[in-house]
Every structure is written in C-alpha cells, then in structure tokens.
Amino acid sequence: MVIIQTLLSSFFIWCIIIAFLGMLQGEKKSAGSSEKNTASNDKAENFSRFAVVICAHDEENVIGNLLENLQSQNYPAEKFHVFVLADHCKDGTVKKAKAFANVTVWQRTGGERSGKGAVLNWGMEKILQKQNGFDRVLFFDADNQIRPDFLQHMNDAFAQGAEIVTGRRLTENPFDSLISQWYTLYWAVVNSLYNRPRQNLGLSSMLSGTGFAFRMELIRDSGWKTYSLSEDIEFTFLENLKGHCVTYLNDAIFYDEQPVRLYVMWTQLRRWCTGDFQIAFRYFGQWVKAFAKKPSWRLWDIFMGVGMTVFFGLTAVSYLIHGSLLIWQGQFPLLAVSTLVSYAATIAVGFAAAAKSSWPVKKLLPGILTFPVFYSLFSYISLQSLFFPQKKWVRIEHKSSKMHF
C-alpha cells in the first residue's frame, strides 16, 4: 500500500519539487514585463493586431464591464477588434454588446449548447475566414474584468518572442463566501506555486480557460479544434506536443468571478476533472510518441501536470484505504500524526500562496484553515468524474459588480 501511495503521490511530489526549485531559481523576467522593452513599442507598427474573443451565454449582467475595460485600454483602438460569440443567448447580451464600438457580435443558434469548446470551434473558423490581418488571438470569458495595461503587456510579451501567453487571474469576489475564498487560494496556488516557478525554470505554464493569447499562425492552417470539456488544458497539451511553450505573464492581470455556493463549485470542478480525463485518454499515445522521439523536461512536466488531476481521486482512495488499515491494526497515533501532517501541509500551502500573491492573509484565514477540505472535496469529485463523467456543459450564472482601476 505504501508503494502504491508513493507512485500515485509522485505527481504531487513532482509539483512540489518544481515549485521549490522555481522559487530558488529566483524571478526570471517574464516576456512583457513592465520593466522591459517599453520604448520599442512607441511606434504603431510595433503593435500586434489582436482579435479579442469573448464567449457569452446569457451574460447581460456582466459583459458590459469587460467591454468598457477593453475600450479603456492603453493600446491603440485600431490595433484590436472584439468578437462576441453569443451562444444561444435569450437575454440582452447581444443588444448590450452591439452598443459598443469596435465590437462584432455573432449569434450561434444552431445545434445544442455544448460548452465553450464547441463555441470556439465555430467562432474561430469564422475569424480565420475573415483574413483581417490579425496577428494574435486573445480569449476572455464574459464575466472577466481587466486592467488598462493588459493588452500592452501581452503585446510586449509577443514582441519578445512568446508564442502563447497567459495572464495572472485574480478573484473579483474573494470574500463573498468560504467557497470564493477557497477559489481565491486555489488560483493563488496556480499563479505563485505552479505557473510562476515554471516560468523561472523555462518550463511551460498552464492555460486556465481565460485571459490568454497566442500567435494566430499556430492555428491558421489547422483551425481551433478541441474536443474535451477542458479546452484550455487540451490546447496547452497539444501545443506542447508541437513544441510550443506557454509563457506566464505576472503583470497582465485580469479578474474572474468565482462561485460562492457548494453546488456551483461541485459542478465546475466536475467539469474540469471530466475534461482532464478526456485529455489523458485521448492524447496519452501522442504524448508517448512525442516524448520517445524527443524527450524533454518540458514534455515530462506537462504530462505530470495533467496527470496530477487524473490521479487526484485515486490518491485519495489509497490514503483512505491506508487509514482504514491503520484503524483495523489499532495504530491510532500513526493515523492521527499522518492526518495532522497532511492537514498542516495543505494549510501551509494556502498560507504561502496567499502571502506570495499579496492577499490579506487575515481576511482569508477561514479559507486557509479549511483549505484541506477544498482539496478533499476536489479529490472526491475527481474520483466521481472518473466513473461518472459529466456529459454536458452546465452554465454558471455571473453577477459580479464593476471594478474600478
């Protein structure tokens, strides 16, 4: 049992090692850092032309905030155009989006509403057909809000050679509930202990659904084609197989509304886990061929990153079985110690992530002290998704208020 636990835990151990080495390495300037190459972007010909893509399904409550943010960018208006992909919208999303200049709204009414991946497959094909000279594609969800310098930072990153860039996701509603606190800590872990260390080590970061961009030539011939419920992770995985690395841009900050209720959290995490399983089953053979042909730490790391979610539930089961055996053998002190160590370690991770992300630790203390509960639920959801995968995309309602920058 100990051997099985060690094998399953190897994914988490690997991530801990990378996080530790990345922090020891020290800060490597991200492409597009505010301290680099600002002078070279004074001339208009050095500005990339962005196709800004927003997926929306009944988002009239929030999409106006993002569109206002885009109009307030410190970036030439003629160098980007917004495409709103309105998927089976029955509210005022289309009307609200059309009221903004520099915005094209396409309404998808055919077929069933099957999630963002299908909408992007449809919308990106239309954008590619237009041939309007776009250099980059930038993706947002309708509930996002962005700082005025977001596009400028993205442009700087591409000017310095980046191929795929992801920004730093922060929570719009960090203190609304215990659930939103957990999400705030989770994204702090992703930013500070997953993506940033990999940036420092020259490995690939992971896309996370929104707030990312890439060079148009990556899909100009093949188009955008994803099949899983986690189109962001799928795109990351496929591009890494082709040799394209994801750059993490700490200065490109965007905000995302997080769930506040357990049911909504459960639904979202189940979709993520189902998508990761779909990716693992579909592309494992391709990964083996790519790694055998040209082994690299980058390919190994991206496999471990996806595998961590895949084996999350199995790891929890192994520890549950191990704990049951300890109880049956009467080794209660050993069980208590191992449980407390695991609990304390997870709290320490939450505390470190919050501190490194400059969140007020005192205000997040309820979330930090119960962070192990979040990961315990996450592991159960992962196991549930393995045997009972989520079949359809489920909408999450957004109600976030406007932020002021």
Question: Where do the model's predicted regions map?
Answer:
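Acidic helix N-cap motif at the loop->helix transition within catalytic regions
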Residues: 64, 91-99, 107, 116, ...
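Cell-envelope/extracellular polymer assembly enzymes that use nucleotide-activated donors
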Residues: 48-51, 81, 234
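Short, acidic, metal-binding catalytic loop of nucleotide-sugar glycosyltransferases
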Residues: 68-79
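A conserved acidic beta->alpha catalytic loop
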Residues: 86-94, 110-112, 145
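Long helical/loop segments within the catalytic core of UDP-sugar-dependent glycosyltransferases
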Residues: 109, 113-130, 149-228, 270, ...
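Acidic donor-binding/catalytic loop of UDP-sugar-dependent glycosyltransferases
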Residues: 92, 140-157
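Juxtamembrane C-terminal module of membrane proteins
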Residues: 20-48, 285-302, 325-405
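N-proximal low-complexity "stem/linker" segments adjacent to membrane-targeting elements
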Residues: 1-68
